[in-house]
Amino acid sequence: MRAVTRSRSQLYSSMLTPLLFLVFLGNGVSEGLAPANLTAGNFTAYLVAGVVVMTSVFSATFSSASYYKDRDSGILRMLLSSPNSARTVLFGKSLAGVCIGVLQGSVVLLLAAPFVEFEWQYGVLPGLGVALATIVLLNIMLSGLAQALASRVETMQGFHLVMNLALFPLLFFSGAFFPVDNLPMWLEVLARINPLSYAVDALELAAYADGTAGFFGLAVDFAVLTVLAAAVYALGLARTPRLTWSGK
């Protein structure tokens, strides 16, 4: 975590990019181009859930990319030669990534809240609690996925390519930028099998959608996110990291 806080360019860019996306796209589309049947009062408010998920995606990618710096500098080999097990080392690194992602996602949500029309159907504090729990589960899942990929993809460039190829299509078909109900059947199927859809839906229900407006429902959202977070995070910890280009 200290390395990320010292890298101001990484810290600021991973938070400012989603916020700028929210400001310019939200205000631009709100002027006459907003999709119908929004669960929020306006398109800017609707985008907040997707922007928080986008922040978590950026954070997981950037945090896990530090694996390559540690590997190439010999730090990872030194850590793995310590009395601690490989899983303990990976747990510490991934936990730091989870904490950073949760912090950044929460900051984006809190910065956006005063400027958009949130309904807080459960009340402000319970709504924030639901949103925070969603952000935590989302970042656990993303951190596990990023850790599993980083331990197998040889180069940082390849890692970023695989992460972008895997996550950005999921982000676009998650309801982050347009409602997923009343879409063609094949898009609705993609939304239902998309893990990010459940995070977006839970954040929408926490902040501005009423109880009947959620695509899946809060209970289903948390059940899916909890199972996926546990399974994917366990997979990330189970992958033995490669220390050399040959994989040894």
Model region roles, listed by residue range:
Residues 86-163, 213-237:
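Alpha-helical transmembrane segments and their short interhelical loops
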Residues 20-24, 43-115, 146, 165, ...:
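Hydrophobic alpha-helical transmembrane segments of multi-pass membrane transport proteins
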Residues 11-20, 154-175:
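Pore- or pathway-lining transmembrane helices of multi-pass membrane proteins that form conduits
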Residues 25-34, 58, 112-121, 153-155, ...:
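Short helix-capping/hinge motifs at transmembrane helix termini and TM-loop junctions
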Residues 35-39, 121, 171-231:
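Membrane-interfacial helix-loop-helix junctions in multi-pass membrane proteins
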Residues 14-15, 47, 51, 70, ...:
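Residue-level recognition of transmembrane alpha-helices
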Residues 240-248:
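Short cytosolic juxtamembrane segments of multi-pass membrane proteins
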Residues 1-17, 245-246:
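Aromatic- and glycine-rich beta-strand/loop motifs that create alpha-glucan
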